[in-house]
Swiss-Prot record:
Entry superkingdom: Bacteria
Annotated EngA-type G domain residues: 2-167, 182-358
Any one biological process term the GO annotation gives: ribosome biogenesis
The name this protein goes by in its record: GTPase Der
Upper lineage: Bacteria, Thermotogati, Thermotogota, Thermotogae, Thermotogales
GO MF entries: GTP binding; ribosome binding
Keyword terms, alphabetized: GTP-binding, Nucleotide-binding, Repeat, Ribosome biogenesis
Binding site for GTP 1: 8-15, 55-59, 118-121
Role, per record: GTPase that plays an essential role in the late steps of ribosome biogenesis.
Record-linked Pfam families: KH_dom-like, MMR_HSR1
Gene3D superfamilies per the UniProt record, alphabetical: 3.30.300.20, P-loop containing nucleotide triphosphate hydrolases
The keyword Repeat is annotated on this UniProt entry: yes
InterPro entries, sorted: G_ENGA, GTP-bd, GTPase_Der, KH_dom-like, KH_dom-like_a/b, P-loop_NTPase, Small_GTP-bd
Ranges of residues in domain KH-like: 359-439
Length: 439
């Protein structure tokens, strides 16, 4: 599918334009400069035409820190990979030296360019800045207001025309594709190695990796085909403790996006920093994924930094069973994302967890196993479980009819254990139980 890259200096409204084009708020928008760091991608559907759109970090002529410099390098690298560039400028505040600097860089890419003059609400300001806009050398701009949605359809039509003139196909069966994609999010504390793992699986630098916790702010996704199977991998911002997050801060927005990514996933990979071990925040993250009915995989990363790891592996397994006992049905994977070790095992675990999430068992098998369970371990006094059946998938959900007595939590856990050990293991998938009175 063709890819369109949004490029411009900081704070010209690239992320607002991106969100308007894809039809929902995916890129974080804030008045501060340099909010977008990674390349955030989405899909634009316009009647029967579809294409990918990528929001990039603002390019500074003289970056002030290492993160902004790496963001600039990532954007420059993508200039030659895209099929079309949207060069976004600010019609409200006029053309600056940074715009001319960026125009020279874009020209060197020899790519097709559409000049987009954003913040064009004021006709007077547009007219005042028109001579400088044409000096950029990219011909007639399209004047838009991403904030108000002005001329967005005109911009999309221009994009479609340019892409089709290059012989690129914009036709795709979105319904068929969406049904076959496994959606996987990487969740964890800041600096657990999520972005390194994301880049290692993609086999290219797609998101920034630095030793500084919290480098990733947006949730960044990429569609990948591995062994004929499609995966949508999502790298998320590290989830910070609530007590450390100002409700008005960018970290708050990042936390919200990360939780939203969990909700939109089939499989959640909970990435643990092997050096620090499982923390209370990791437990909280696991609880969020379980409560939302997502398949989970627990992965210890950075094992390359653990001396004599093979002799300490059992310690990590014990730590998993002790601190993440409530998702002990999850596959446990050991990784070195930076060295690309353990990634094949991770992909296999994702496949197995996805299968479990969608698996259905026969009603006869459920009742046979539950009757045997009750014969060996009778329910609490006064409680009768009459029969049960699986009523849903994603997650596997079972409905049991009872005589109306409340089923205590310990006995619910016993039912789940019986299902896993005697019917189907549902590796990686939580089992939800419902109870209904039938007199």
């Amino acid at each position: 599918m063709p890819t369109v890259l949004i490029v411009g200096k900081s704070n010209v409204g690239k992320s607002t334009l991106f969100n308007k084009l894809i039809g929902y708020k995916k890129s974080i928008v804030d008045d501060k400069e340099g909010v977008t760091r990674d390349a955030v991608s989405g899909r634009v559907s316009y009647y029967s035409k579809t294409f990918n759109i990528v929001d990039t970090g603002g390019i500074f002529e003289n970056p002030e820190d290492d993160i902004i410099n790496k963001s600039k390098d990532l954007t420059l690298k993508m200039l030659n990979e895209a099929d079309l560039i949207l060069f976004v400028i600010d019609a409200k505040n006029g053309i600056t030296s940074e715009d001319y600097y960026l125009a020279d860089i874009i020209r060197k890419s020899n790519n097709d360019v559409i000049l987009v003059s954003n913040k064009s609400e004021s006709e007077r300001r547009v007219q005042n800045n028109l001579p400088d806009i044409y000096k950029l050398g990219f011909g007639d701009p399209i004047f838009v207001s991403a904030e108000q949605g002005k001329n967005i359809d005109t911009l999309i039509e221009r994009i479609v025309n340019v892409l089709e003139s290059k012989g690129l196909s914009l036709e795709e069966n979105l319904k068929e594709e969406s049904q076959s994609i496994i959606r996987v999010s990487f969740i964890g504390r800041p600096n657990a190695g999520k972005s390194t793992l994301f880049n290692s699986i993609l086999n290219k630098e797609r998101v920034l990796v630095t030793p500084i916790p919290g480098t990733t702010r947006d949730s960044v996704d990429e569609l990948v085909t591995i062994n004929g199977r499609k995966y949508l991998f999502v790298d998320t911002a590290g989830l910070r403790r609530k007590s450390k997050v100002d409700y008005k801060s960018l970290d708050m927005y990042s936390n919200v996006r990360s939780i939203k990514s969990i909700e939109n996933s089939d499989v959640v990979v909970i990435l643990i920093d092997a050096i620090e071990g499982i923390t209370h925040q990791d437990q909280r993250i696991a609880g969020i994924a379980e409560n939302r009915g997502k398949a989970t995989i627990v992965a210890f990363n950075k094992i390359d930094l653990i001396k004599n790891f093979k002799y300490k592996k059992e310690e990590f397994i014990d730590q998993f069973n002790e601190k993440l006992y409530f998702i002990n049905y999850s596959p446990l994977i050991f990784l070195s994302a930076i060295n690309k070790k353990g990634i094949d095992n991770l992909i296999n675990a994702i496949d197995e967890a996805y299968k479990s999430l969608h698996y259905r068992v026969q009603t006869s098998a459920v009742n046979s196993a539950i009757q045997r369970m009750m014969a060996f371990t009778p329910p609490p006094k006064g409680l009768k479980i009459l029969y049960g059946t699986q009523v849903d998938i994603r997650p596997p959900t079972f409905l049991f009819f009872t005589n109306g007595k409340k089923v205590p939590e310990f006995y619910q856990n016993h039912i789940r254990k019986t299902i896993r050990e005697n019917i189907y293991p549902f590796v990686g998938a939580p089992i939800f139980l419902k109870f209904k009175s039938r007199h």
